[in-house]
Amino acid sequence: MSIHQSPIKRRESKKIWVGNVAVGGDAPISVQSMTNTRTTDVEATVAQIKSLERVGADIVRVSVPTMDAAEAFKVIKQQVNVPLVADIHFDYRIALKVAEYGVDCLRINPGNIGNEERIRAVVDCAKDKNIPIRIGVNAGSLERDLQEKYGEPTPQALLESALRHVDILDRFNFENFKVSVKASDVFLAVESYRLLAKQIVQPLHLGITEAGGARAGSVKSAVGLGLLLSEGIGDTLRISLAADPVEEVKVGFDILKSLRIRSRGINFIACPTCSRQEIDVIATVNALEQRLEDILTPMDVSIIGCVVNGPGEALISDLGVTGSNKMSGFYLDGVRQKERFDNEKLIDQLEAKIRARVAEQHNRIQIEQI
């Protein structure tokens, strides 16, 4: 097997649609984020959603806590292209209202929106409009009786909570849903998802909730989601960070990219640097990451500071640079080229080569489609 292929065999699951994005089945694992603006501030919320679209978010969730927020949601929905999930708790009327306004998915827990009549109203509405539901179980808001039964959040408690909500939807013959069982503790979340994956065929929405700030939260999410994804568990994911939501999307794609599950944009392979480096690897990588954020074409680019590991990494890269005194070696598809890069102009030259390679690939695809 090529090192560029993922050996992971995904769990079989039912496919549902969130707007025009398939979730589950053979669909690519989608990356989500959530706005952190006041939903009633339409201008700020739309701006944030568009910034998430630009970095590749497949789906965006918006909290809708009030009827005023529901009215704002209507205006927001008209101004963005990405599918929107409405996050709703307690008031079933809000769910009915955003359904009128074209919501692409409802994030609710059927058991906390009222009596059976209210649940039926929401489920029937979702059926009529073909709107999927996400059951979102969270260790921080576990039902009181389950807290008393288990003493604390446990994998069995989260599983029981999830299946309780699943049973409610089953009673109404509603199958268009996905489920999450999130926790801030990696082991708790991972084991909860493992148990749930054995019990249902619906898609699973992965996340380590309240993971923390940008650095610690990214690490915690990478560990937890990496374990699950490597076992084939998971159909869509959201990285929860106390940071700019744009970072959540970037980290989500980086996790998928690291497991060769879904590649998007440039995968930079760069050495941590030492006294042997002949080029400023750190400055080069940082500059190119910023300059090439608009590139969506998957591509491996190695930037190694010296000839110890540089040639070997270049062999398995689309483009590679090996640092050398004044003029650095350049590799294309693992083959060393006669052309060399002036170290003083390395960033500009490598950016030009990458963009030329992207254009070449796009042209080839267009010709093949004729």
From Swiss-Prot:
Q: Which InterPro entries match?
A: Dihydropteroate_synth-like_sf (IPR011005), Enolase-like_C_sf (IPR036849), IspG_bac (IPR016425), IspG_bac-typ (IPR004588), NO2/SO3_Rdtase_4Fe4S_sf (IPR045854)
Give the source's domain of life in one word: Bacteria
Q: Which cofactor does it need?
A: [4Fe-4S] cluster
Catalytic reactions on record? (2E)-4-hydroxy-3-methylbut-2-enyl diphosphate + oxidized [flavodoxin] + H2O + 2 H(+) = 2-C-methyl-D-erythritol 2,4-cyclic diphosphate + reduced [flavodoxin]
What remark does the entry make about the cofactor? Answer: Binds 1 [4Fe-4S] cluster.
Q: What is its EC number?
A: 1.17.7.3
**Protein name according to UniProt:** 4-hydroxy-3-methylbut-2-en-1-yl diphosphate synthase (flavodoxin)
What organism is listed for this UniProt entry?
Actinobacillus pleuropneumoniae serotype 5b (strain L20)
